[in-house]
C-alpha cells in the first residue's frame, strides 16, 4: 500500500490502524536545532483526541506522544523524528458484525477489492484515527514556521452557518466551546443541533474555514505544485472531506471580472483579497483563507442496508463509538495539514534563497 507519505522537504509518513497496537509516524526534513515545545504538541493532541465532549465519539484515548528519535536535549537534530501513539481503548468486538459485510459510504468494499484483505476493526487504516499522527507532524511544523499563524474554526453544521467574515471574528473564542466556532451564538445553535442529531442515531456534516496569516510572498511552485493545489490535496486527504474552495471560491464563478479583479495598493497589498492570498499559485503576502466541506459520518446508529461478501443485501445496525459530526474534532487536523504544507513550501523557498 502506497500513499502513506506527504511532502517534499518537510515530509511525514504515517503508519498504524484504528485498533492496532499503536499509530505513529516519521517526520523527515525537519531542520536541526529547533527547540521543541513538547507541551504544545500534546495540547494539539488534546484538541483532536476523542471523548472530549458529549458531541464527539466517547472512545477514551490519552493520545500521549512517545518520541523515539530525532530529538536530543529538547532540540531537533535534523535526523528523522520517529514517534508512536499507543492505542489503549479499542473495543474490536463492536465491529465483529461487519467482518463479512460492507457498510455504505465506507472504505470497506474498495479496500477489500483492492488489497484482498481488510482490517474491519474500526475501519483499520481508513479510520480517522490515522490523523492523530498528522496532528503531531503539524504541531512540529507550526514550530518550524512560528511567524506564520494558522487558525481554523467550524463555520457551519448542517444548514446552520456562521456568516460573519473572518476579519470580524475573535479566534481566541474558538476553543471556548465544544463546537470550536468563534461566534458563541452560532456555536450554541450548532451544538444543540448536533445533540438533536445524535439522539436520532443520525449524523450531520459541516464546513471548516482556515485562515493563514503573516505568509511571506513567494511560496508555491507553478505549474503543478501551486500553493492552493497542495493545500487542496492536503485537505482532500483528510477523512470525510468532500470539497475545498479558497478565496472567492465557487462564489467567484458568479461574478464579473470587473468586480472580481483584486487591484493593488501602492504598498503591494490588494484591496479585496478575493484571490485568497494566492495568485498564479504563489502566495502574495495577503491572508490565505479557504473552506473545507465534510460529509456526515457514514456510521449510523440506525438500521441501514449493507452488502455482504456473498452479494446479499441485509439490514444492519451500526455499533461502536462514533462522532455524530466530525467537524469539531477536525479543526486541529485541518490546521495540522495546513502547517505541514506551509512548512514544506517555506523550507523549499529557503533553499532557493540560499542559492
From Swiss-Prot:
List the GO terms this entry assigns under cellular component, sorted alphabetically.
cytosol
What is its pathway? Metabolic intermediate biosynthesis; chorismate biosynthesis; chorismate from D-erythrose 4-phosphate and phosphoenolpyruvate: step 7/7
Q: How is the cofactor bound?
A: Reduced FMN (FMNH(2)).
| Plastid as UniProt keyword | no
Indicate yes or no for the key word Hydrolase: no
Which GO BP terms sit in this record?
amino acid biosynthetic process; aromatic amino acid family biosynthetic process; chorismate biosynthetic process
Binding-site residues, FMN: 125-127, 239-240, 280, 295-299, 321
Question: What keywords tag this UniProt record?
Answer: Amino-acid biosynthesis, Aromatic amino acid biosynthesis, FAD, Flavoprotein, FMN, Lyase, NADP
Reaction catalyzed: 5-O-(1-carboxyvinyl)-3-phosphoshikimate = chorismate + phosphate
EC number(s) given by UniProt? 4.2.3.5
Subunit: Homotetramer.
Q: Which HAMAP family match?
A: Chorismate_synth
Reported function = This reaction introduces a second double bond into the aromatic ring system.
Q: Which family does it belong to?
A: Belongs to the chorismate synthase family.
The protein's name is: Chorismate synthase
Amino acid at each position: 500500500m502506497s500513499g502513506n507519505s506527504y511532502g517534499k522537504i518537510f515530509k511525514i509518513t504515517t503508519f498504524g490502524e484504528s485498533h492496532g497496537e499503536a499509530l505513529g509516524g516519521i517526520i523527515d526534513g525537519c531542520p536541526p536545532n529547533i527547540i521543541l515545545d513538547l507541551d504544545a504538541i500534546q495540547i494539539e493532541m488534546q484538541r483532536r483526541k476523542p471523548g472530549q465532549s458529549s458531541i464527539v465519539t466517547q472512545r477514551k484515548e490519552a493520545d500521549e506522544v512517545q518520541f523515539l528519535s530525532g530529538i536530543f536535549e529538547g532540540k531537533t537534530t535534523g535526523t528523522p523524528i520517529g514517534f508512536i501513539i499507543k492505542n489503549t481503548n479499542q473495543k474490536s468486538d463492536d465491529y465483529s458484525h461487519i467482518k463479512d459485510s460492507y457498510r455504505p459510504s465506507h472504505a470497506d468494499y474498495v479496500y477489500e477489492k483492492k488489497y484482498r484483505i481488510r482490517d474491519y476493526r474500526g475501519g483499520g487504516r481508513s479510520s480517522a484515527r490515522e490523523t492523530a499522527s498528522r496532528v503531531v507532524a503539524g504541531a512540529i511544523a507550526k514550530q518550524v514556521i512560528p511567524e506564520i499563524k494558522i487558525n481554523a474554526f467550524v463555520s457551519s453544521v448542517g444548514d446552520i452557518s456562521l456568516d460573519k467574515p473572518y476579519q470580524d471574528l475573535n479566534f481566541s473564542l474558538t476553543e471556548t466551546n465544544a463546537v470550536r466556532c468563534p461566534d458563541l451564538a452560532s456555536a450554541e445553535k450548532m451544538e444543540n443541533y448536533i445533540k438533536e442529531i445524535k439522539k436520532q442515531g443520525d449524523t450531520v456534516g459541516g464546513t471548516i474555514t482556515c485562515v493563514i496569516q503573516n505568509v511571506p510572498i513567494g511560496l508555491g511552485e507553478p505549474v503543478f505544485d501551486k500553493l492552493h493545489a497542495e493545500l487542496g490535496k492536503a485537505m482532500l486527504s483528510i477523512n470525510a472531506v468532500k470539497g475545498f474552495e479558497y478565496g472567492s471560491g465557487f462564489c467567484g464563478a458568479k461574478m464579473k471580472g470587473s468586480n472580481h479583479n483584486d487591484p493593488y495598493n501602492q504598498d503591494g497589498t490588494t484591496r479585496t483579497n478575493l484571490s485568497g492570498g494566492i495568485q498564479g499559485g504563489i502566495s502574495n503576502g495577503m491572508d490565505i483563507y479557504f473552506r473545507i466541506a465534510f460529509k456526515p459520518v457514514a456510521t449510523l446508529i440506525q438500521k441501514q442496508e449493507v452488502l455482504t461478501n456473498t452479494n446479499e443485501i441485509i439490514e444492519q445496525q451500526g455499533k461502536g463509538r462514533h462522532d455524530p459530526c466530525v467537524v469539531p474534532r477536525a479543526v486541529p487536523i485541518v490546521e495540522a495539514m495546513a502547517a505541514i504544507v506551509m512548512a514544506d513550501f517555506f523550507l523549499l523557498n529557503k533553499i532557493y534563497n540560499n542559492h
